[in-house]
Every structure is written in structure tokens, then in C-alpha cells.
Amino acid sequence: MGPVTGTDAGTEHGQAEQPEGRGTGAESTAERSARFERDALEFLDQMYSAALRMTRNPADAEDLVQETYAKAYASFHQFREGTNLKAWLYRILTNTFINSYRKKQREPQRSAAEEIEDWQLARAESHMSTGLRSAESQALDHLPDSDVKQALQAIPEEFRIAVYLADVEGFAYKEIADIMGTPIGTVMSRLHRGRRQLRGMLEDYARDRGLVPAGAGESNEAKGSGS
């Protein structure tokens, strides 16, 4: 594996990526390793879930997480304690996926455990600060995991990653912009379009199961387009 670049390690955006905070020579390799194990490995399961959403293949997800943590460890001296470690790790994960795994992805293994955990669904339902509406929250509460999975996998990749980071992981717009390396306006656009597509599919699933009255989604869309 080649040297970690500033882009991969997340050194271009946000104070969490600045090589500051610990004096030169103030931390030994053993101390840094212990700090990495203590702080970074806490997010391992969440990182794997995110990698699985991106790659849609368990083997690729494992490889992506392994490479992400190798890069994170190599550049951990650049991370400033007390800032957002989770966002810093997700930036490395997302950049590694975009730069590597997107180009050489294997075919998805649909039968594998591509699951959204119950706690993730609950967080997605309760994450209302950026505008989730009743259709999503109702569907996430009542629909089978397989339906939510299928809907998320069906929306385009850039939308899927933005929606995942916002509505499952709970990142704010600015954090998502830093993670994805895009302007906040682009993040907002991707979230709006991704959520709209996701809402339409979830409403279809919910109508098929009698959870949403027939025509409810269409009437809301008509109101929105007429305003």
C-alpha cells in the first residue's frame, strides 16, 4: 500500500485533520498505538456497516475497513485529540472507497448479511433535525428491514452515501461535506434528491402493506410541486 495522501487521511478539510495538538516527540509509538486502539477501534462496527452500505459486498467491506484503519493509524499523529474522530475516520473511509473500491467493486452478494441494525433504524427515525418526514419515519418503524435495505440500495451511490451519513450515522451537513469532500450545497442537494427517491420507494412498500393510504404520497407530491 502506498503512502497516505492528505486527501485519503482527511487533512484538507476541518480542524480535526490539522497536524496539531501534541508537541513534537511528546508521544511515543507505543502510546500512540494504545491511544489508537482505545479511541479508533470503538467505531469498528459502525465503519463496517458503512463500508457494507458503500460496497454492497462483505468481502470488499472488510478490505475497505482494513485499508481505512491502516491509513488512519499511519496518519493518527495528525489527528487532534478532542475533535471529531468519527468524522475523521469516515472521511478516510469515504475517500478510500471513492478512490479505490468504486473502480474495482465485485458484484454484490445479495444473500450475505447486508443488514441495517435495529439501533441504526431507530436513529434514522429519530434524526429529525435535517428534515425527515413522516413517510420515512413510519416506514422505518413498521417496514421489514429487507424493504428498507432494498430501497437504500436502489438509490444512486452519491445519494445513498449522503443519506446514510445523515440519517443513519447522524452527521450534520458540514460534517458530511468534510467527509465527502463536497460543498455543503452539494450535500443538501444530494440529501434532498436521495430522500425524495427513498421516500417514494418506502411509500410504495408501505402502501403495498396497507401502512399508508393509497394516493397519500401522490397528493403530498402534488402539493409540493404546486407551491
Swiss-Prot record:
Which GO terms fall under biological process for this protein? Answer: DNA-templated transcription initiation; regulation of DNA-templated transcription; response to oxidative stress
Q: What happens when the gene is disrupted?
A: Increased sensitivity to redox-cycling compounds menadione and plumbagin, and to diamide. Loss of expression of mycothiol biosynthetic and recycling genes.
What keywords are assigned to this protein? DNA-binding, Sigma factor, Transcription, Transcription regulation
SUPFAM superfamilies per the UniProt record, alphabetical: Sigma2 domain of RNA polymerase sigma factors, Sigma3 and sigma4 domains of RNA polymerase sigma factors
GO MF assignments: DNA binding; sigma factor activity
Question: Region Sigma-70 factor domain-4: start and end of each range?
Answer: 148-198
DNA-binding region positions on the chain: 173-192
Question: Which CDD domains does this chain map to?
Answer: Sigma70_r4
Instruction: Supply the induction statement.
Output: Expressed from 2 promoters, 1 of which (sigRp2) positively regulates its own expression. The same promoter is transiently induced (about 70-fold) by the thiol-oxiding agent diamide. Also induced when mycothiol is oxidized or conjugated.
Q: Region Sigma-70 factor domain-2: start and end of each range?
A: 43-106
Q: Where is this region: Disordered?
A: 1-33
Give one Pfam family, short name only. Answer: Sigma70_r4_2
- Report the residue ranges where the short sequence motif Polymerase core binding is annotated in this entry: 63-66
Regarding how it is modified after translation, the entry says: SigR is present in multiple forms of different pI, suggesting other unknown post-translational modifications.
Functionally, this protein is described as follows: Sigma factors are initiation factors that promote the attachment of RNA polymerase to specific initiation sites and are then released. Extracytoplasmic function (ECF) sigma factors are held in an inactive form by an anti-sigma factor (RsrA) until released. Responds to thiol-oxidative stress, involved in regulation of about 30 genes and operons, including the thioredoxin system (trxB-trxA, trxC), ribosomal protein L31, RNA polymerase-binding protein RbpA and mycothiol (MSH) biosynthetic (mshA) and recycling genes (mca).
UniProt lists the family membership as follows: Belongs to the sigma-70 factor family. ECF subfamily.
Quaternary structure note: Interacts transiently with the RNA polymerase catalytic core formed by RpoA, RpoB, RpoC and RpoZ (2 alpha, 1 beta, 1 beta' and 1 omega subunit) to form the RNA polymerase holoenzyme that can initiate transcription. Interacts with cognate anti-sigma factor RsrA under reducing but not oxiding conditions, which prevents it from binding to RNA polymerase. Treatment with the thiol-oxidzing agent diamide inhibits the interaction.
Per the record, the domain comment is: The sigma-70 factor domain-2 mediates sequence-specific interaction with the -10 element in promoter DNA, and plays an important role in melting the double-stranded DNA and the formation of the transcription bubble. The sigma-70 factor domain-2 mediates interaction with the RNA polymerase subunits RpoB and RpoC. Interactions between sigma-70 factor domain-2 and anti-sigma factors prevents interaction of sigma factors with the RNA polymerase catalytic core.
Q: State the protein's name.
A: ECF RNA polymerase sigma factor SigR
Q: Which organism is it from?
A: Streptomyces coelicolor (strain ATCC BAA-471 / A3(2) / M145)
